[in-house]
């Protein structure tokens, strides 16, 4: 049984992870921890369904609400403030936390020698030099699970030349505010235009 901790369990990645676990063979995975910032009602429903050992809630008011609600139905579930505990009890940590807030989850998982299913790109972009040495800890492993970096990972692992070191990767933008623009029009792009990146529902 793989013990799974899900940081950002009420976000897109977290919900998809729970869907996969729900549809897997019974006994294949056990959700041992769920983590949210402030989505109290959603995480209470998830906790009642998956019966984790701990629920991490960053926001104090939301944490108090979650603790009250679970105390009546699931008193064995511990409600805590810090996400670091998750990686101690899990075999696999899914990091679906948005932004720089996900760095502590990434670092704790790797320091504890866990497999990290990483959707939080900011951990590597903003703190790559800090995170990279942690990969050398026995058992520590990063598996990219979101969008482009997962696709690259799969391509590299399926290549007949996978033993060779990759010297350079080029990622092309498939969308964004400048899709369809010609080179001449890109010369006068403003900061405001560059920041107007489209978003979509996952």
Language model regions located:
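N-terminal glycine-/serine-/threonine-rich beta1-alpha1-beta2 phosphate-ribose binding loop
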Residues: 1-100
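Active-site-proximal loop->helix
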Residues: 16-26, 45-46, 124-139, 155-158
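A short helix->loop->beta-strand "cap" motif at the edges of active sites that frequently abuts
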Residues: 51-53, 74-77, 112-115, 137-140
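Short beta->alpha connector loops at strand-helix junctions that form conserved
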Residues: 58-59, 119-121
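Short gly/pro/ser/thr-enriched loop/turn and capping motifs at secondary-structure boundaries
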Residues: 62-64, 123-127, 149-151, 176-178
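Rossmann-fold NAD(P)-binding glycine/threonine-rich loop
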Residues: 66, 100-112, 121-140
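Rossmann-fold dehydrogenase core element
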Residues: 131-149, 168-169
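Conserved anion/nucleotide-ligand pocket segment
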Residues: 149-202
């Amino acid at each position: 049984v793989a013990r799974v901790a899900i940081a950002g369990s009420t976000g897109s990645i977290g919900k998809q992870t729970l869907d996969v676990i729900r549809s897997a063979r019974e006994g294949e995975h056990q959700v041992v921890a769920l983590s949210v910032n402030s989505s109290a009602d959603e995480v209470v429903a998830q906790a009642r369904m998956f019966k984790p050992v701990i629920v991490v809630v960053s926001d104090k008011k939301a944490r108090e609400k979650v603790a009250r609600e679970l105390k009546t139905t699931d008193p064995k579930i511990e409600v805590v403030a810090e996400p670091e505990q998750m990686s101690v009890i899990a075999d696999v940590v899914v990091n679906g936390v948005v932004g720089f807030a996900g760095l502590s989850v990434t670092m704790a998982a790797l320091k504890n020698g866990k497999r990290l299913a990483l959707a939080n790109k900011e951990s590597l972009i903003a703190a790559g030099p800090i995170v990279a040495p942690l990969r050398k800890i026995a058992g520590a492993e990063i598996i990219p699970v979101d969008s482009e970096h997962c696709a690259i990972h799969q391509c590299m692992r399926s290549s007949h030349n996978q033993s060779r070191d990759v010297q350079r990767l080029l990622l092309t933008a498939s969308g964004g505010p400048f899709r369809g623009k010609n080179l001449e029009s890109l010369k006068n792009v403003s900061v405001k235009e560059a920041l107007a990146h489209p978003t979509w529902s996952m």
